[in-house]
């Protein structure tokens, strides 16, 4: 018999740096999950991702207080800011441009994000990421 799902918890946690402090501790604690067990499992799973990169995770909590989790790829905005070397996007993206990204950088980000994107091929994924870049106030070269 399948376990009964009690809750889904969606968090963004720095890769390899999960610890019991907020936001992880309170979110898991209110559902009775063993926080240290999650932190150790999450850190082990994200050790191959660049440390400190925010990584979305969906935690499924079952009625017997056990859990499973699925890690997603880092948000496109974070990867774009890293590629462009900027701290934050533009407040008025259509008027003020804050940086530039090339098609090669977009392709690299699209390959990283491919498991989470609904794009049918790499070119469609690149166009999706380029749209995110433009809405952040980045110039897109070579597209």
Swiss-Prot record:
Processing and modification events after translation: One or more lysine residues are methylated.
GO term, biological process aspect, one: translation
One GO CC term on file: cytosolic large ribosomal subunit
Origin superkingdom: Bacteria
Entry keyword annotation includes Ribonucleoprotein: yes
Gene3D superfamilies given in the database record: Ribosomal protein L11, C-terminal domain, Ribosomal protein L11/L12, N-terminal domain
Gene Ontology molecular function: large ribosomal subunit rRNA binding; structural constituent of ribosome
Pfam families from the UniProt entry: Ribosomal_L11, Ribosomal_L11_N
Keywords tagged on the record: Methylation, Ribonucleoprotein, Ribosomal protein, RNA-binding, rRNA-binding
Family: Belongs to the universal ribosomal protein uL11 family.
HAMAP family: Ribosomal_uL11
Function description: Forms part of the ribosomal stalk which helps the ribosome interact with GTP-bound translation factors.
Record text on subunit structure and interactions: Part of the ribosomal stalk of the 50S ribosomal subunit. Interacts with L10 and the large rRNA to form the base of the stalk. L10 forms an elongated spine to which L12 dimers bind in a sequential fashion forming a multimeric L10(L12)X complex.
Name by which UniProt lists this protein: Large ribosomal subunit protein uL11
Organism of origin: Chromohalobacter salexigens (strain ATCC BAA-138 / DSM 3043 / CIP 106854 / NCIMB 13768 / 1H11)
Name of the encoding gene: rplK
């Amino acid at each position: 018999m399948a376990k009964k799902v009690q809750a889904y918890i969606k968090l963004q946690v720095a890769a390899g740096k999960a610890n019991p402090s907020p936001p992880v501790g309170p979110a898991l604690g209110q559902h009775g999950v063993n926080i240290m067990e999650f932190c150790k499992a999450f850190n082990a799973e994200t050790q191959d991702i660049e440390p400190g990169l925010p990584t979305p995770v969906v935690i499924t909590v079952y009625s017997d207080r056990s859990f499973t989790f699925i890690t997603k790829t880092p948000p496109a905005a974070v990867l774009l800011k890293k590629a462009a070397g900027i701290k934050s996007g533009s407040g008025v993206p259509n008027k003020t441009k804050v940086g530039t990204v090339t098609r090669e950088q977009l392709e690299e980000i699209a390959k990283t994000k491919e498991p989470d994107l609904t794009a049918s091929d790499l070119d469609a994924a690149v166009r999706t990421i380029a749209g995110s870049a433009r809405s952040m106030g980045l110039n897109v070269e070579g597209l």
